[in-house]
């Protein structure tokens, strides 16, 4: 069976995007792993699947699969590419798009010059909603992981994030400590690990080790999580520029109970077909 797809990226965080509205598709874990292989497949960080809405009040349902085949709840860079994809493919003729994910609803707004603003929803600090094993919510936690002792902030942006402040992201042990923290026993669903360097009150540098993927050039939910942690700790202002290896995102958050807004690019690379 031939499947149409598009290759897209948000700041180098790359995706295979598939229309599951006009074509019937099913992807097993093994198939996703093969497609994700950068030597023998298409190559991507995540596969994004556009499905008909589960709720008639919404436009689409948004599913995300990591390169290891695992399904995850949210992907911010993917959300921007999702919005541009459905518009490019004529699946919708509006610039404001409402979708559901495994963890709730998000709204997408197409802007000019391939920019998309995403309402990422309200961040969750309650341990049970992250999920994270702790008796109560704290602004920082001290975690021990093998020979490391880590001070971090923990939050859910629809998926779990652990944010570690470092003096320099260039020297941060992203691959080693990221892999250890991803599977820390206090995160029952594993965790995305961000390494954040404070530049000033309106700018940070960030590298992210994504669960099920490893380090990526950009992570939208990771950028949101880092900004939210910095703002909640009183170190950052309400609007933050996040510099990632793949480029920059703008994150805005007014505080507890308020949604996080992320603005950044979504690029279409090519269209293709593949036999499944």
From Swiss-Prot:
The keyword Isomerase applies. Its EC number is 5.1.1.7. Coiled coil: none annotated. The record marks 270 as: Important for dimerization. It comes from the Bacteria. The record marks 161, 210 as: Could be important to modulate the pK values of the two catalytic cysteine residues. It holds the Pfam family DAP_epimerase. Substrate binds at residues 13, 46, 66, 76-77, 159, 192, 210-211, 220-221. One of its GO terms (cellular component) is cytosol. Its main location: cytoplasm. One of its GO terms (molecular function) is diaminopimelate epimerase activity. It is found in: Cytoplasm. Keywords: Amino-acid biosynthesis, Cytoplasm, Isomerase, Lysine biosynthesis. InterPro entries: DAP_epimerase_AS, DAP_epimerase_DapF. It catalyses: (2S,6S)-2,6-diaminopimelate = meso-2,6-diaminopimelate. The keyword Isomerase applies. Gene3D superfamilies: Diaminopimelate Epimerase, Chain A, domain 1 (3.10.310.10). GO terms for biological process: lysine biosynthetic process via diaminopimelate. Signal peptide: none annotated. The active site is at 75 (proton donor), 219 (proton acceptor). Pathway: Amino-acid biosynthesis; L-lysine biosynthesis via DAP pathway; DL-2,6-diaminopimelate from LL-2,6-diaminopimelate: step 1/1. Catalyzes the stereoinversion of LL-2,6-diaminopimelate (L,L-DAP) to meso-diaminopimelate (meso-DAP), a precursor of L-lysine and an essential component of the bacterial peptidoglycan. NCBIfam families: DapF. Belongs to the diaminopimelate epimerase family. This is Diaminopimelate epimerase. The gene is dapF.
């Amino acid at each position: 069976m031939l499947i149409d797809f598009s290759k897209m990226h948000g700041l180098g965080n790359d995706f295979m995007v598939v229309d599951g509205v006009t074509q019937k598709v099913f992807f097993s874990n093994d198939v996703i792993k093969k497609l994700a292989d950068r030597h023998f497949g298409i190559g991507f960080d995540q596969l994004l699947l556009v499905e008909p809405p589960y709720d008639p009040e919404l436009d689409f349902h948004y599913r995300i699969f990591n390169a290891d085949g695992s399904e995850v709840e949210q992907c911010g860079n993917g959300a921007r590419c999702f919005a541009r994809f459905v518009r490019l493919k004529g699946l919708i003729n509006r610039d404001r798009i409402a979708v559901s994910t495994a963890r709730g609803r998000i709204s997408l707004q197409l802007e000019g010059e391939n920019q998309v603003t995403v309402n990422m929803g309200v961040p969750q600090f309650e341990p049970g909603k992250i999920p994270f094993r702790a008796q109560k919510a704290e602004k920082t936690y001290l975690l021990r992981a093998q020979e490391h002792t880590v001070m971090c902030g923990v939050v859910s942006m629809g998926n779990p994030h652990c944010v570690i402040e470092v003096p320099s992201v260039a020297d941060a042990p992203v691959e080693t400590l990221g892999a250890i923290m991803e599977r820390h026993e206090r995160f029952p669903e594993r965790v995305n690990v961000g390494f954040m360097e404070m530049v000033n009150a309106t700018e940070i540098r960030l590298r992210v080790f994504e669960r099920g993927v490893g380090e990526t050039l950009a992570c939208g939910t990771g950028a949101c999580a880092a900004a939210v942690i910095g703002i909640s700790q009183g170190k950052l202002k309400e609007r933050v520029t996040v510099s990632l290896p793949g480029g920059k995102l703008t994150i805005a958050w007014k505080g507890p109970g308020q949604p996080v807004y992320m603005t950044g690019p979504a690029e279409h690379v090519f269209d293709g077909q593949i036999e499944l």
